[in-house]
Amino acid sequence: MRLMVSGGGTGGHIYPALALIERLKQVEPDTEVLYVGAKRGLETKIVPQAGYRLETMEVQGFRRSLSLENVKTVYLFLKAVAQAKKLIKDFRPDVVLGTGGYVSGAVLYAAAKLGVPTVIHEQNSVVGVTNKFLARYVNEVAIAFEAARSQFPKSSVTMTGNPRAQQVAQRTNSAYSWTEDGLKDGVPTIMIFGGSQGAPRINKAVVEALPSFNEQPYQVIFATGRKRYDDVMGALAGQPIGDNVKVVPYIEDMPDKLPHVDALVSRAGATTIAEVTALGIPTILIPSPYVTANHQVKNAEALVKKGAALMILEDQLDGRSLITQANHLMNDAAVRQKMAANSKAVGHPDASDQLIAVLKKAIADHQK
């Protein structure tokens, strides 16, 4: 298969695409891939590191207020469409996949206008602006949350899940030991993190809850975010940190460690939810209030309704609420087991295979 992929700006658009490519290369080793991203997006670092060819173009989003910048946005979009058409004609993809971000708008629009099979993948429960725009032009739509289905006008909408789910599910036999992080094997473990940058409100709640965490029969690994580690350690100065608590800047090799986690505290981003449901990890979700259309709350609610997670809204988060919910999970194995089963029931551990099937359907329909 010759696959062109476009998605960028944030990891939530990039990592699912890379997970899909990784799986496609496993089942079809001769697959050729061209990734098209934005000049200033995270993809400029992540995609080349993964070993794939990357082409970039300049794009930007619309301002909500009247602004001359919106004139520039239209100009850049039209310029990007022209660039994308040239790339498509040169690369000759069998299918083009968009995973969100402004750059995918130009690339998928160009592909549709050239009559190339097109598929978009929506990771969240609230459909992004770019995918809403593209829905009327593309051949197939793939979703990771059932709530997204009604937001698309097309009949050809397929639930696939998020490819990151399969990538994580394939690593369940990792030989990781908690001793590598200064903790013990065989002790129930809860992991707490607020994303790669960390989340100040989550960090503050953990600092407040630390005296209680120190006394628990379970152990805690807490990632502050690289940029916030010094601040957190400063706030903890003079406080004893129990042998059952490990504070780190960042969780390295997350896919290898997640299968060994008994519970998780995290934001409610699409990638995180895909990972925890693929593995069936009981989770306390703290949705970020700083995202478009409050989509993390909707993501979290989808799991809470299924008994697959607990949720604490950020304005209700403090040390007391955090330790109360953590103890509810960690000190009752039956509660954890039930939530783990519910979580796994809504997961998609074969998400990449499902999305590959959608790509192949788009190609086959085009050839009829």
UniProtKB/Swiss-Prot annotation:
Report the subcellular localization: Cell membrane
Record's bilayer topology term: Peripheral membrane protein
Q: Which domain of life is it from?
A: Bacteria
| SUPFAM superfamilies registered for this protein in UniProt | UDP-Glycosyltransferase/glycogen phosphorylase
MF-aspect GO terms? undecaprenyldiphospho-muramoylpentapeptide beta-N-acetylglucosaminyltransferase activity
Q: Which GO terms describe its cellular component?
A: plasma membrane
Keywords for the protein's UniProt record, in alphabetical order? Cell cycle, Cell division, Cell membrane, Cell shape, Cell wall biogenesis/degradation, Glycosyltransferase, Membrane, Peptidoglycan synthesis, Transferase
Main subcellular location: membrane
Q: Does the keyword Glycosyltransferase apply?
A: yes
Gene3D superfamilies named among the record's database cross-references: Glycogen Phosphorylase B
Q: In which pathway does it act?
A: Cell wall biogenesis; peptidoglycan biosynthesis
Q: What positions does the entry give for UDP-N-acetyl-alpha-D-glucosamine binding?
A: T10, G11, G12, N124, S196, I251, Q296
| A biological process term (GO) from this entry | regulation of cell shape
Q: Which reaction does it catalyse?
A: Mur2Ac(oyl-L-Ala-gamma-D-Glu-L-Lys-D-Ala-D-Ala)-di-trans,octa-cis-undecaprenyl diphosphate + UDP-N-acetyl-alpha-D-glucosamine = beta-D-GlcNAc-(1->4)-Mur2Ac(oyl-L-Ala-gamma-D-Glu-L-Lys-D-Ala-D-Ala)-di-trans,octa-cis-undecaprenyl diphosphate + UDP + H(+)
User: Does the keyword Transmembrane feature in the UniProt annotation?
Assistant: no
EC number in record: 2.4.1.227
- Name the InterPro entries on file: GlcNAc_MurG, Glyco_trans_28_C, GlycoTrans_28_N
The family this protein is said to belong to: Belongs to the glycosyltransferase 28 family. MurG subfamily.
Quote the function comment for this protein: Cell wall formation. Catalyzes the transfer of a GlcNAc subunit on undecaprenyl-pyrophosphoryl-MurNAc-pentapeptide (lipid intermediate I) to form undecaprenyl-pyrophosphoryl-MurNAc-(pentapeptide)GlcNAc (lipid intermediate II).
Name under which the protein is recorded: UDP-N-acetylglucosamine--N-acetylmuramyl-(pentapeptide) pyrophosphoryl-undecaprenol N-acetylglucosamine transferase
Species of origin reads: Limosilactobacillus fermentum (strain NBRC 3956 / LMG 18251)
Underlying gene: murG
